[in-house]
């Protein structure tokens, strides 16, 4: 494994199967967050921001936006509304691009190649017009007719696409799991009301993705709900990703403000950015202009908690021995990790 692959992390899921029933699910997410933090601690805000693109492949723009918001807040500088709106647009454009690729490459959304290329090109073109806003303490951009025209073209191209409902194109893939009844309910969705509790944990050097010891879900994984069968669960996850893509395109016309984080101490900053998988959070403390503390929580940290949806929904589930690995892979893909994963089936 290369150094960059090690920094990306990896997901390991082990299932113990006995007499055709899943008895245990061990979800281990290896995320080298302490190593990433050490690469940023001691850096100035500007130097840390220059390092970030080298550390993250997926959700790179969202990582940049969340970090900018945290660093600027820690430095006591508030970006004006126009800058924040532009940064939100930048994150949403990345979310749209990554979601489209996921829908086509993983879930085989029937989109003509030329239309997909056109949508991705519009996302890239619009993002390039906003790139200047990734500077620390960025100034607002002048009125940009080309940007607005590109965003309008993106919305029109999406409307013209009229993607079908997941059940319409996934049916052969879903039919395989119609008889697999899932277990207990997944964790609750993480809400903005829980930010103060999460902040208290982070201040105590507890960066676990949970609230008061309980896991949470974020992004499309949270909105998919608890479905009775594996077939319906996968269908709802793909549908949630499709709806999130449409929502992101709609939001480009009037970008929402990120959730407010109250009660921050001097030199402390928290930044949030929405990704295709849910909210990304960075917490930074500056000491004499240099980074003293850097913490981050990504959607994958929440959605692949050891006591998260895989364990809660799969324990006690009856499935044929020859089908369990394929089922596990489909459910992992539905939860959409931002890291590579591997699965292991132990026959007890």
UniProtKB/Swiss-Prot annotation:
Pfam families linked to this entry: NiFeSe_Hases
Taxonomic superkingdom: Bacteria
Disulfide bridge partners, by residue number: none
Organism: Azotobacter vinelandii
Gene3D superfamilies: Cytochrome-c3 Hydrogenase, chain B (1.10.645.10)
Protein name from the UniProt record: Hydrogenase expression/formation protein HoxV
Gene Ontology molecular function: nickel cation binding
